Curated annotation (Swiss-Prot):
GO terms for cellular component: nucleus. Keywords: Developmental protein, DNA-binding, Homeobox, Nucleus. It is found in: Nucleus. Residues 84-98 have a biased composition (Polar residues). Coiled coil: none annotated. Residues 125-184 bind DNA. It comes from Xenopus laevis. The keyword DNA-binding applies. PROSITE patterns: HOMEOBOX_1, HOMEOBOX_2. SUPFAM superfamilies: Homeodomain-like. Gene3D superfamilies: Homeodomain-like. InterPro entries: Distal-less_Homeobox_TF, HD, HD_metazoa, Homeobox_CS, Homeodomain-like_sf, HTH_motif. This is Homeobox protein DLL-1. The gene is dll1.
Amino acid sequence: MTTMADGLEAQDSSKSAFMEFGQQQSHSQQSSPVMAAGHYPSLHCLHSGSHHHPQHQHDTNYSGSNSYSRSLAAYPYMSHSQHSPYLQSCNSNTTTQSRAEEPDQQKTTVIENGEIRFNGKGKKIRKPRTIYSSLQLQALNHRFQQTQYLALPERAELAASLGVTQTQVKIWFQNKRSKYKKLIKQGNNPLEIDQLAGTVALSPRSPAIPPVWDVSASKGVSMAPNSYMPGYSHWYSSPHQDTMQRSQMM
């Protein structure tokens, strides 16, 4: 009887030990999703959002943020990724590029005395040079011989008479004064040079040199009335005359 009682007690103890092991295993399985959610917060948030009611979404997100901070504490290299030199260089390049683009967008064009400037600073964009006619140059030189400096009313009157702007007259007089001073330093007489240049510019063509279209007339070559080439036909014999001469020689 004692042996049977001992066998029953051994079976009961083995059953109780097996049941305790099963309870511990089930408890570990229930705690493992919580640990997994602590290490992988994104999956836990997705799982909770898909299977739970929307009213519990705020609680799950808050728990997910806490678990995310804990995961960053567990992996410190992830928290220092934003301080990497590559990301810092990219951020610095973007900031410098945005700062460089700001002044270009704020630039405005300003026109001063016929010259275009950007914000009143920087390089000037020069307009093309003004080409004066011979009559305009003669009037400007004549007025420059009278006076090298013009008052505002005189400049306006001269510009209106020549059909140019006051700025063009002002610039022409400035350039003329600088050339005049250079010629004086070189020991030349600028007035004589101006008079010579004016006579050459306004003098008619020399009659000793015939024009190109009068060369044929000067040589006495006759031209046919309805042709543009001079009559050189007497230099060449026609093919009919060549055949007649050959038949006579035979």
